[in-house]
Swiss-Prot record:
Residues bearing PTM N6-carboxylysine: 99
A GO cellular component entry from the record: cytosol
Keyword set includes Metal-binding: yes
Binding site for Zn(2+) 2: 99, 136, 174
Catalytic activity: (S)-dihydroorotate + H2O = N-carbamoyl-L-aspartate + H(+)
Species annotation: Sinorhizobium fredii (strain NBRC 101917 / NGR234)
PANTHER family reported in the protein's UniProt record: DIHYDROOROTASE
GO molecular-function terms, A-Z: dihydroorotase activity; zinc ion binding
Protein name: Dihydroorotase
Binding site for substrate: 15-17, 41, 136, 219, 251, 263
EC top class, as a word: hydrolase
NCBIfam families membership: pyrC_dimer
Residues binding Zn(2+) 1: 13, 15, 99, 247
Sorted UniProt keywords: Hydrolase, Metal-binding, Pyrimidine biosynthesis, Zinc
Amino acid sequence: MQELVIRRPDDWHLHLRDGGVLRGVIGDTSRHFARAIVMPNLVPPVVTSADAAAYRQRILAAIPAGDRFEPLMTLYLTEGTDPDDVEAGYGSGLVKAVKLYPAGATTNSHSGVRDIAKAMPVLERMAEIGMPLCVHGEVTTPEVDIFDREAVFIETVLDPLRRRLPDLRITMEHVTTKDGVDYIKEHAGNLAGSITTHHLIINRNAILVGGIKPHYYCLPVAKRERHRQALRAAAVSGDVRFFLGTDSAPHVDPLKECACGCAGIYTSVNTMSCLAHVFEEEGALDRLEAFTSLNGPAWYGLPANEETITLRKANEPVRYPAKIETEAGLITVFDPLFPLYWAVA
């Protein structure tokens, strides 16, 4: 049996939701991951440091006994966000980053930014104090094709923002295109990118071929195969600017399996198994630790975890549940469409 020992991983982009869903999903992350950047797009969103402190307490209360897990809190950027509150939250260590959602870009993003100029006082303060900005990198203007949203965002929003505030540390979250990968590679400095598990595995065919597959629908939407290959190359390269952010996003089945289904794929259950498969397929198992456990902490100015986990490759496929039960209902687990042989021991 093949074994791989790596430092305990972190998840640099995670949705935990709240209430019954939070209590149902938190263990799937805390079992294997030491830390996670927790997204603030609740209803209502986490917009102040006080909101973040209260949400953090709800997360801590939901962690299964015996698990050691640290939620890293973020604030939801609005056009009315108070720079002083942001600085105070960051200075206290409570808040690790601010999240920019263009209004309407994804789940619970209607409170997001419509005019980035109105958020400039906060962004200028963040640049001064070295606080990271996590960006959902898509435009939402109706004339832009959904498959082009990321490339247009880079050209019309991200690049001008970086020119105006070159000291602002920006995480381009859930990169989905070759355009995004190339932009990060070509622009040294305060820029890095997270990559999801599922975007390394599926392209847009998974959603559309043979019928609509709602459990492969996410935002940013999966793209063409050439983009998936670019993401794989970046993830397995060892480049310190790329790291894991699963964007694991639980929705109960009725919210996915309907006429207007929610965007999000739930990967927390089997992410490490999927990633071991991908990195083995690419001949890069020796660089899995960098992607999951080293590059992210380095970017966020945190020490790498001292604890380790062991991944073992079995002779027979590992069985994962197709769904998990929560107080709010069933949530479908990501199916990578191939058998998984690696599992955390």
